[in-house]
Curated annotation (Swiss-Prot):
Keywords: Disulfide bond, Fimbrium, Signal. The gene is fimI. Disulfide bonds join 43-83. Residues 1-19 form the signal peptide. It comes from the Bacteria. GO terms for biological process: cell adhesion involved in single-species biofilm formation; pilus assembly. This is Fimbrin-like protein FimI. InterPro entries: Adhesion_dom_fimbrial (IPR000259), Adhesion_dom_fimbrial_sf (IPR036937), Adhesion_dom_sf (IPR008966), Bact_Fimbrial_Adh_Pro (IPR050263). GO terms for cellular component: pilus. Pfam families: Fimbrial (PF00419). Belongs to the fimbrial protein family. It is found in: Fimbrium. PANTHER family: FIMBRIAL SUBUNIT ELFA-RELATED, FIMBRIN-LIKE PROTEIN FIMI-RELATED.
């Protein structure tokens, strides 16, 4: 019996002796990289121009007689404020959005019931040059200290032979590149 108690005590003693110890184990986990860019101060986009709506109006589908024919121009302006020419002297604008299936340079007005067909929205700079969507800026405008206004034109453009009536809304977002 004494032997059994001694054996039981000898087997339980190491567990009680180690119960208060905590063992920390450090294993290799991996590498981390932190990446980013700190940009110099550029222009501030006027608040109302960040969520702009350009009213294209109502246009008869009979007005379009050929592929590539445009509607009357609808001007719009992106206002830049608090610009510094110390950082950059020129700015380029790129427009991005869903391209029309027949003409990748213009914005799609969508598909489905009630949507106009064979029509897209084409964007132009203030000199009348087409600004193809989803491409880097091709035309650069001079920046002025303080405020700079960037003038553009939107036009409906026939992308097929027969334009049909319906909703003709397109959506785009723009990015600014400074040089």
């Amino acid at each position: 019996m004494k032997r059994k108690r001694l054996f039981l005590l000898a087997s339980l003693l190491p567990m009680f002796a180690l119960a208060g110890n905590k063992w920390n184990t450090t294993l290799p986990g991996g590498n981390m990289q932190f990446q980013g860019v700190i940009i110099a101060e550029t222009c501030r986009i006027e608040a109302g121009d960040k969520q702009m709506t350009v009213n294209m109006g109502q246009i008869s589908s009979n007005r379009f007689h050929a592929v590539g024919e445009d509607s009357a121009p609808v001007p719009f302006v992106i206002h830049l404020r608090e610009c510094s020419t110390v950082v950059s002297e020129r700015v380029g604008v790129a427009f991005h959005g869903v391209a029309d299936g027949k003409n990748p340079d213009v914005l799609s007005v969508g598909e489905g019931p009630g949507i106009a067909t064979n029509i897209g929205v084409a964007l132009f700079d203030d000199e009348g040059n087409l600004v193809p969507i989803n491409r880097p800026p091709a035309n650069w405008k001079r920046l002025y200290s303080g405020s700079t206004s960037l003038h553009f034109i939107a036009k409906y453009r026939a992308t097929g032979r027969r334009v049909t009536g319906g909703i003709a809304n397109a959506q785009a977002w723009f990015s600014l590149t400074y040089q």
